[in-house]
């Protein structure tokens, strides 16, 4: 049973959270919509985490999962805002982040992505004869781009190759919340998209730049997490992801040096030594990506 001090402490925390997120006290969102602060939050259902900025007058959506999930997210937005969405931003081109774009076709003013994201998405759509089922960016980012809203500034910044060759970080500057897309998989084996321009070496460097660029108070949203871990993270989680990639690099290079084949390493590996928090399915993808990058070193 809670004592009075614990009760008052919890009540104060809830009150403070509501103050940071006035929308929470006015509207009833679905359980998979979480507002963090400064009218910025995220939506989870199936696929990569959707980020959002939401007021009665303006809104921003980051990534869209799949059409059904995008429609559900749009319904949440419509509880607050009936206006056109100001910005739809894609962190990268993968289908679990972009397949829902088409749902926003007639209700968004501007679609933004890195130039390589647009190239990759168009290439994939054409290969699948599905260009009409996709919504491509009309505004592309090369190094950085900023967008001004009434009460928020949104910066999209490219730090370099990582999960693909077109990953951007989207920073709500006033709220000081940054959506990382799939540059961080929180304690979950990552997809390292070699055909899409991924590089383990470059990913490690990209994460270093991110850690140094944002301040100690920045809250981060990542695209995926182990079911035991959150998608709302901090710099220590980015460092943990960086450590995973570094330990993967060390491990694969040693296996190559020892003369082991990719198949032999897959057969014997369930975790990456030095990054034991990463468990479950998916280590095979990391091994394959590692061999693609380091087998001819």
Residue map of PLM features:
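Metallo-beta-lactamase
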Residues: 117-160, 164-165, 173-174, 214
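Active-site neighborhood of phospho(di)ester-bond hydrolases with catalytic His/Asp-centered motifs
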Residues: 62-64, 86-94, 112-114, 179-181, ...
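Ligand/cofactor pocket segment of small-molecule handling proteins
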Residues: 149-206
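Divalent-metal (often Zn2+) His-rich catalytic cores of metallo-beta-lactamase-fold enzymes
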Residues: 204-260
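Conserved beta-strand hairpin/beta-sheet module of binuclear metal-dependent hydrolase folds
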Residues: 34-76, 170-171, 176-182
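N-terminal secretory signal peptides and thylakoid transit peptides that target proteins
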Residues: 1-18
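C-terminal regulatory/interaction regions
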Residues: 260-297
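Active-site metal-binding motif and surrounding structural segment of the metallo-beta-lactamase
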Residues: 57, 68-112
């Amino acid at each position: 049973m809670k004592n009075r001090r614990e009760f008052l402490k919890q009540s104060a925390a809830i009150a403070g959270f509501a103050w940071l997120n006035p929308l929470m006290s006015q509207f009833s969102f679905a359980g998979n919509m979480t507002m963090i602060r400064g009218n910025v939050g995220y939506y989870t259902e199936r696929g990569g985490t959707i980020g959002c900025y939401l007021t009665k007058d303006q809104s921003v959506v980051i990534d869209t999962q799949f059409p059904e999930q995008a429609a559900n997210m749009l319904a949440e937005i419509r509880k607050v805002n009936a206006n056109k969405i100001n910005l739809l931003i894609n962190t990268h081109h993968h289908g679990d982040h972009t397949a829902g774009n088409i749902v926003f076709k007639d209700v968004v003013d501007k679609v933004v992505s890195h130039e390589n994201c647009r190239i990759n998405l168009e290439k994939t759509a054409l290969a699948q004869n599905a260009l009409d089922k996709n919504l491509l960016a009309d505004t592309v980012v090369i190094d950085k781009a900023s967008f001004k809203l009434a009460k928020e500034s949104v910066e999209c910044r490219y730090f370099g190759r990582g999960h693909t060759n077109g990953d951007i970080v989207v920073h709500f500057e006033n709220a000081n919340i940054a959506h990382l897309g799939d540059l961080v998989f929180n304690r979950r084996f990552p997809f390292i998209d070699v055909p899409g321009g991924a590089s383990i070496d470059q990913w490690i460097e990209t994460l270093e730049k991110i850690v140094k660029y944002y301040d100690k108070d920045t809250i981060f949203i990542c695209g995926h997490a182990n079911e035991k871990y959150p998608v709302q993270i901090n710099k220590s989680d980015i460092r943990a992801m960086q450590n995973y990639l570094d330990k993967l690099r060390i491990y694969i290079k040693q296996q190559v040096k020892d003369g082991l084949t990719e198949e032999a390493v897959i057969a014997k590996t369930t975790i990456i030594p030095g990054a034991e928090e990463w468990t479950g399915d998916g280590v095979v993808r990391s091994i394959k990506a590692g061999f693609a990058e380091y087998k001819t070193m």
